[in-house]
Design a protein with these regions (language model features):
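Short E/K-rich amphipathic alpha-helical oligomerization segments
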Residues: 144-169
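Alpha-helical oligomerization segments
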Residues: 160-205
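N-terminal Sec/ER secretory leader and immediately downstream segment
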Residues: 37-105
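Non-transmembrane amphipathic alpha-helical segments
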Residues: 118, 125, 132, 136-153
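Sec-dependent signal peptide recognition
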Residues: 19-27
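Sec/Tat signal peptide C-region and signal peptidase I cleavage site
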Residues: 32-36
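Short, charge-rich amphipathic alpha-helices with coiled-coil/heptad character
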Residues: 98-126
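N-terminal secretory signal peptides that target proteins for export/translocation
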Residues: 1-20
């Protein structure tokens, strides 16, 4: 059964004036944080998955090899394959070239190393995103407080111009950070997707 697309409630575009932006700033990240349902500071629409399990991608038992970083051949391969700057096709080519000649019995340990490295990098990314989410929440509260102060001032009050300038600078910084976070939030999910690709490649060998 196919779901019917929801029709927009309003066909007419609703424009939000700049005077309303400060009051909306504190709520901008709340819907995505609510989707995470795990950490209120998680700023992404994507579900928060703190750590990836090898069993989610690989059938059967996989025993992690904690000393894989001491392997002079395996360590540089894993770091290159998992590196976010390595394009997908280059990463799969490197992994395929390494995995083709090795026995099938060694491939689970190879995949476990890929999972370890992925989790290490994702953990750093997730911590940074949560820290950024906390900063955005605090910034939204600051903007809302400045707006409340402005509401209590008369147009001719001397303090008004300074507060408006401060509020607008904070709002601009808030909006720019939100824009950057939309892209940064894709990184943990992209790493999870790539890990699934690597698992399928190794299982086909």
């Amino acid at each position: 059964m196919t779901k019917r697309a929801k029709r927009p409630l309003l066909r007419r575009r609703v424009m939000i004036g700049p005077e309303l932006w400060p009051r909306l700033a504190i709520f901008i990240i709340l819907p995505s944080a609510a989707l995470a349902q795990q950490d209120p500071a998680w700023p992404c629409a994507q579900r928060l998955v703190p750590s990836l399990s090898a069993g989610s991608f690989w059938p059967g038992q996989i025993t992690s090899q904690p000393n894989w970083r001491d392997d002079d051949a395996l360590f540089p391969l894993v770091t290159a394959v998992i590196d976010r700057d390595t394009p997908d096709d280059a990463a799969t080519a490197k992994l395929s070239a390494y995995a083709t000649p090795i026995p099938a019995a060694r491939r689970p340990a190879l995949f476990a190393a890929l999972v370890d490295q992925t989790n290490d990098i994702r953990d750093v990314l997730i911590r940074r995103l949560i820290k950024l989410g906390r900063r955005q929440i605090a910034m939204g509260q600051t903007i809302a407080a400045l707006s409340s102060k402005l509401d209590g001032l008369k147009p001719e009050d001397a303090a008004r111009e300074s507060l408006v300038g401060e509020r607008d600078l904070d709002l601009r910084a808030f909006s720019e950070t939100q824009h950057v976070m939309r892209y940064a939030c894709e990184a943990p999910a992209n790493m999870e997707r790539r890990l699934g690709t690597f698992a399928r490649l190794l299982l086909r060998k």
